[in-house]
Amino acid sequence: MERLVIRMPFSHLSTYSLVWVMAAVVLCTAQVQVVTQDEREQLYTPASLKCSLQNAQEALIVTWQKKKAVSPENMVTFSENHGVVIQPAYKDKINITQLGLQNSTITFWNITLEDEGCYMCLFNTFGFGKISGTACLTVYVQPIVSLHYKFSEDHLNITCSATARPAPMVFWKVPRSGIENSTVTLSHPNGTTSVTSILHIKDPKNQVGKEVICQVLHLGTVTDFKQTVNKGYWFSVPLLLSIVSLVILLVLISILLYWKRHRNQDRGELSQGVQKMT
């Protein structure tokens, strides 16, 4: 009696695939992750950047560096053996305010424009080497707004100026008929930008008593600045010239009358003196 034996070939491809899948799972499970968060803070206020090592690996030292064009610059380190060590260039400017080898926080006491940029936190871990994360700090300046108006010869100029960092945007909330708008942008050495918008209103009398609204957009927030145009005094050039000419004429007539009066008085006194002598 013959027996039929079927031999199944061993699949090397399936074995290799299984090995690669298992290796990928292990690597993903063991992958080290550093969690950071970018911050935006106002100029000349404190600011903090945080880093968190999201695994159970043991860190030996934590280093904070500032990213620069050529190479990162060491700022401060922390370890259990040496504590906090701040580089001379950053003394009295920063400190590590959360001491730990898993979670670390640096704080700037009074941020300036030079502090804006990106920073790296490096965890020197046992078995994984240096694991880094990056957090960026953005510095902003709140808008300083000026709103005023001025009557000219035959029109009304309303000016709204906003200075901030980053550059603000200026809008108007007024009727558009008979109104022209011009905008000028100026960058300052301190990093702020001024945006000045001027409304040219051709019929100023119709704007008297009405409210003008200047809207400033900065960092996603719109703020309204309001002002009511009060009655002003404006003259046309011909009218102004006529008034000036009339005033000059009156002054000349007054001088002439004054001169004639004194002349007559002098003649009268002279004639009286002659009569007495005779």
Curated annotation (Swiss-Prot):
Residues 1-30 form the signal peptide. CDD domains: IgV_1_MRC-OX-2_like. Its main location: membrane. CD200 and CD200R1 interact via their respective N-terminal Ig-like domains. InterPro entries: CD200_Ig_V_dom, Ig-like_dom, Ig-like_dom_sf, Ig-like_fold, Ig_sub, Ig_V-set, Immunoglobulin_dom, OX2G-like. This is OX-2 membrane glycoprotein. The keyword Transmembrane helix applies. Keywords: Cell membrane, Disulfide bond, Glycoprotein, Immunoglobulin domain, Membrane, Signal, Transmembrane, Transmembrane helix. One of its GO terms (biological process) is negative regulation of canonical NF-kappaB signal transduction. It is a single-pass type I membrane protein. Residues 31-141 form the Ig-like V-type domain.
